[in-house]
Amino acid sequence: MGGTFDPVHNGHLVAASEVAALFDLDEVVFVPSGQPWQKVHRVVSDPEDRYLMTFLATAENPQFTVSRVEIDRGGATYTIDTLRDLRGARPDDELFFITGADALAQIFTWRDHRELFELAHFVGVSRPGYQLALDAALPANSVSLLEVPALAISSSDIRQRVGRGAPIWYLTPDGVVRYIAKRHLYQSRA
């Protein structure tokens, strides 16, 4: 599951759990982005903070792991590089790339997008009632859409809530709430 995870929240965890159950996955690997090329217009928290929050959020689920592949690579991060790395490390595994359906709708803007579908099956998750018109050019055998239980949670809302001093309990796992407070993350972003 790729994402900025700034911060990771319960919606991410529910989506990962739902996809794992539907596709009978042995493991879901969370891959916090290093320097996401598509988010250069906004401040993104330090990759180490995002990695540690994701680690804390997933630690209780034995099916979840967190990879540093994008963080350790350095520089702008692209999904194609991550999938090539994962394919090299796991040549016999069937890879699924879990992302938001809104991000999946933009996949033709991603670097080397044609090769992406050779490396992994893409799962776009959306909330109930969210209408998504996917490009007809997407290969049907390499892309699935999955509606997950609606959780009105977003990373941007969590950052804004912290910035204005509002509580974030139950929006993100307790360990992440404590980590954000300890590191004073998002407090200057109202």
Curated annotation (Swiss-Prot):
Annotated metabolic or biological route of this protein: Cofactor biosynthesis; NAD(+) biosynthesis; deamido-NAD(+) from nicotinate D-ribonucleotide: step 1/1
Family the UniProt entry places it in: Belongs to the NadD family.
Record keywords, A-Z: ATP-binding, NAD, Nucleotide-binding, Nucleotidyltransferase, Pyridine nucleotide biosynthesis, Transferase
Gene Ontology biological process terms from the UniProt entry: NAD biosynthetic process
Superkingdom, natural source: Bacteria
Gene3D superfamilies assigned: HUPs
Function: Catalyzes the reversible adenylation of nicotinate mononucleotide (NaMN) to nicotinic acid adenine dinucleotide (NaAD).
Classification via InterPro entries: Cyt_trans-like, NadD/NMNAT, Rossmann-like_a/b/a_fold
Keyword Signal attributed: no
EC primary class: transferase
Protein name: Probable nicotinate-nucleotide adenylyltransferase
Keyword match Secreted: no
Organism (species): Frankia alni (strain DSM 45986 / CECT 9034 / ACN14a)
Reactions it catalyzes: nicotinate beta-D-ribonucleotide + ATP + H(+) = deamido-NAD(+) + diphosphate
Pfam families reported in the protein's UniProt record: CTP_transf_like
GO molecular function, one term: ATP binding
EC number: 2.7.7.18
